């Protein structure tokens, strides 16, 4: 079902972003601040909380695995219910609120295990909100402009997240001398700053979002909940019968595993190699700055060569990146090379996967289908991070 009062007017693919598209994009700027902090600062802080014989790569890998598993189990069920008119924004708000509150809670004086538990909850909040946010793409723009809008989301998310991140890093390194604060206190303050940024850049979406495509009205919510499991089985059957869709899902499962594992484990892996925290931070900033134009460029190239062609090109590039990381990543120089290579392709492959999927699914069942999208994506994340964590635990060597 489609709400005719909220359908977007036809906009040429080459036209500038509309107000509705910009307000959708800006949430990527907000949540990406937490993503970047999770990649650079939080693993280093968590390592400082662990006992001397603790293994941060293993612990971090298991934390990522647990968070991914919870999301993979929850999202298809909640996604089916969220297709009811008006429910998508409520579920989004619930997960977003969980992420922000637990991001603030990480500033509490916790030992390493409770800290990881709170971090897992924050990650669940983030990833849960992103599932509903991704499905909002179909409400924010048209099929013809999805590649462009999705790419701008990732691109501006990469560059926008560097603003609070640079401020937090300056506070962590300069705060002890400027304010007579400890490094630990400055790090905890960075969690609060990130949460505030996240909230500030979510407000435009919360105040303007209108669900264009939906499956049922409010008075049908009870029956929608009761029939969720049978509907999920039916949806899975439809996916299996839709050859382009299930072929994409299988391919997505395998290639996104590499993408998610490299992103989530890069800092802890670099720290285990002995790369100091300053170099890790600068390398990740370089990744963000490289990813900004490359993600937007990928959206433009998709308009010229086609989305599938550009996804294939990014997959081939990522295969080379993973091969490089597995066999050549032994020092700071190789880590810098990895940072630049990842920045060139990660935004494009994520953005175009999101938009391509949005174009081939039924719009009035978008949340349900994006729930299955998350099953494949998060299960892939579970496999990658679990393998890294287990291998490190068994061998005692991250490399």
Question: PLM features: residue spans?
Answer:
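Hydrophobic core of transmembrane alpha-helices in multi-pass small-molecule transporters
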Residues: 102, 113-129, 334-348
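A membrane-interface helix-boundary motif in multi-pass transporters
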Residues: 172-196, 390-399
């Amino acid at each position: 079902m489609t709400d005719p009062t909220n359908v977007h007017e036809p906009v040429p693919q080459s036209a500038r972003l509309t107000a509705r598209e910009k307000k959708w994009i800006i949430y990527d700027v907000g949540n990406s601040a937490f993503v970047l902090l999770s990649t650079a600062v939080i693993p280093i802080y968590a390592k400082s909380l662990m006992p001397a014989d603790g293994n941060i790569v293993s612990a971090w890998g298991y934390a990522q695995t647990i968070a991914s598993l919870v999301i993979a189990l929850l999202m298809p069920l909640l996604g089916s219910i969220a297709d009811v008119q008006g429910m998508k924004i409520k579920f989004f708000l619930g997960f977003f609120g969980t992420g922000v509150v637990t991001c603030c809670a990480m500033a509490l004086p916790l030992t390493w295990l409770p800290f990881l538990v709170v971090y897992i909850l924050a990650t669940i909040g983030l990833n849960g909100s992103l599932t509903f946010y991704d499905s909002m793409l179909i409400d924010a723009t048209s099929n013809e402009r999805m590649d462009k809008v999705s790419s701008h989301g990732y691109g501006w998310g990469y560059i926008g997240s560097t603003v609070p991140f640079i401020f937090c890093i300056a506070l962590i390194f300069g705060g002890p001398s400027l304010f007579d604060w400890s490094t630990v206190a400055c790090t905890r303050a960075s969690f609060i700053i990130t949460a505030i940024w996240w909230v500030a850049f979510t407000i435009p979406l919360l105040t303007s979002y209108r669900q264009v495509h939906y499956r049922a009205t409010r008075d049908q919510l009870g029956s929608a909940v009761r029939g969720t499991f049978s509907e999920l089985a039916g949806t899975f059957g439809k996916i299996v019968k839709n050859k382009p869709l299930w072929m994409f899902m299988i391919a997505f499962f395998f290639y996104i595993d590499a993408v998610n594992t490299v992103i989530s484990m890069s800092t802890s892996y670099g720290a285990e190699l002995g790369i100091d925290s300053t170099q890790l931070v600068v390398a990740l900033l370089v990744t963000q700055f490289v990813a900004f134009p490359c993600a937007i460029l990928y959206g433009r190239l998709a308009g010229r060569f086609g989305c599938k062609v550009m996804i294939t090109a990014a997959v081939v590039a990522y295969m080379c990146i993973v091969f490089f990381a597995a066999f050549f990543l032994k020092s700071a120089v190789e880590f810098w090379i990895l940072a630049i290579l990842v920045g060139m392709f990660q935004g494009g492959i994520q953005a175009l996967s999101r938009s391509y999927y949005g174009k081939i699914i039924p719009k009035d069942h978008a949340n349900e289908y994006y729930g299955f999208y998350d099953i494949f994506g998060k299960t892939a994340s579970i496999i990658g991070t679990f393998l890294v964590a287990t291998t490190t635990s068994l061998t005692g060597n991250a490399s």
